[in-house]
Amino acid sequence: TFSGCKNEPSSEQKNDKIVYSNIVSEKVQNDLMKILTDSSITTERQNVLFDHIKQFNSIVNSKNLVSDFEEYDAKKTKYDPYDMQDEWNQKSPNFMGYNCRITAFGIYRDFLEIPQNSDVNNEMILFDLSALSEDSSVLLKKNDENAFSIFYSVVPTTLTKDIDTHVATLQESWKNRGIKFAKNKKASLISVMFHESIDENDNYLFVGHTGILFESDKKLYFLEKIAFQEPYQLTRFNNRSELNDYLMKKYDVSYDQPTVSPFIMENDQLLQEYKRITD
C-alpha cells in the first residue's frame, strides 16, 4: 500500500543520508525561485507554490522543519509525522492541505497536454479532489480539474511482475488518451507508479507518489510534497541513481506480493537509472 500522497503519515526509509531542505529560509526560497524560473515555470505558478509552502510552514512548528540544506538520515525525519498531522488538524480542521499530486500538477501543468475527452476513474484520488474542492488555487487553466482527474486516473493492467509490460501498458494508455509531455530541458515529472491488484482480473496502475526533478548548476533537485500533512521538501542529488535509491528505499517496502514493485517514470519513460534496491 502506498503512503506518499495519502492522508496518512509516510513510511520510513532505511539508513541513508540525504541533503534536503523544507524550504523555510529565505535563501533556499530564493534558490528555488531561480531554479523554477530557469526551468520556465511561470511566475503565476511559482506564486501559488510559495503561498502553499509558506502556509504549511507557518502552521507547523518550525523547530521540526529543516530550514537550509542540511544532511540528515533519511530514516529519521526531524518531525514526528503523527504529531505534525495533529498540529495541522488543530490549526486547519476543515482543510487537509495539498499532497504530492496536487503540488506536482500545479507546478508542471503547462508542460502536460491532456485532452478533455478521456474516461475518468477517480478511485485513487478522492482525497485529492476533496482538497481541490476546498482550495482550487493550483487549477489555473479552464478544465484543469478534469485534466487532473484524467491524468491521475488509474490505468488497467495485468497481474504480472514484469516491469516492461507495465511500462508499455502505461505508455499505451497515455498515448491512447492523447496525453503528451512537452519538452523542458531543465525539468521533468517524476512519477512513482504502484500496482494494485484486487484479484487476477482486476489490476491497475496509479501514481503513488510524484514530484518535479530540476537540473541546476550540475546538480539535481527533487521537489515534492511528502504527504497532505507533511512538509514540502527540496532534496539535492548528484545523479539520477541517487534519486532512484531515495525513492525506492522509501516506497519499495512490500515483499512476496503478486504485484510488480514500484517503478519510476521520468515523464513518459522509465527512469534510465531505475533499479530495485536489494540490500
Descriptions of predicted regions:
Residues 35, 107, 246, 250:
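Residues that form generic nucleotide/phosphate-binding pockets
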Residues 6-8:
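Bacterial signal peptide processing site
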Residues 2-4:
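C-terminal motif of bacterial Sec signal peptides marking the signal peptidase cleavage site
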Residues 222-225, 238-279:
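Low-complexity, Gly/Ser/Thr/Pro-rich intrinsically disordered linker/tail segments
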Residues 10-38:
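N-terminal low-complexity, Pro/Thr/Ser-rich intrinsically disordered segments
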Residues 31, 38-39, 45-197, 204-208, ...:
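Acidic/His-rich structured neighborhood in mature extracellular/periplasmic domains
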Residues 11, 199-201:
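Intrinsically disordered, low-complexity coil segments
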